[in-house]
Amino acid sequence: YYKDLSTGKIYAVNAEDYYLDVDAYIQIEPKSKRKFARLWYGWDDFAQGGINEHGLFFDAAITPKQQKIKGYGNPRNNLGDKILALASTVEEALEILEKEKIALNKSHMLFGDRTGQAVIVEWVGGKRKLRWIDDNKLVMTNFLLSKPEAGNHPDFRYDSIIHRINELESSGQEINLNKIGNTFGLA
């Protein structure tokens, strides 16, 4: 998730590297009386990531397994689709997670909205941890940012993405979707 400070443009990029062979697809849901229009990608009626008509973006990534939080659990439905259907801001997405008593113990989620607000949500050590956007970028891969020692860290992809974004920003070149996308795609 990247916000160009000179133009205010927001870019949400994903480089999917899921290690299982799944029959992934893109699902487009039109607006209805009570639900926002949305596009998500995933498989088996499971939204891995997507965006809605109000500019709320989300993505999820597998992380090292954590203990479950008492009274909370993993979703029993298509959580990503539900959030995109009902939330238009990061705060509203967080409210849905809390209302539904969701605490993922094998992954984390990133939410970003059209205002430039973004957060990574992790559930570590029996608590929900929020890592808010700092400056203008928020990146996650497959390690827990709030507990890197849990596994999958150091992560060359994360380091490469941060390095490439910093290089792009200091180059003086125009920042656009292609260039931001390549900071992820080349990692």
Question: Which residue ranges define each predicted feature?
Answer:
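Surface-exposed patches in mature extracellular/periplasmic domains of secreted proteins
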Residues: 94, 106-109
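Acidic, contiguous internal or C-terminal segments within carbohydrate-active enzymes
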Residues: 81-90, 94-100
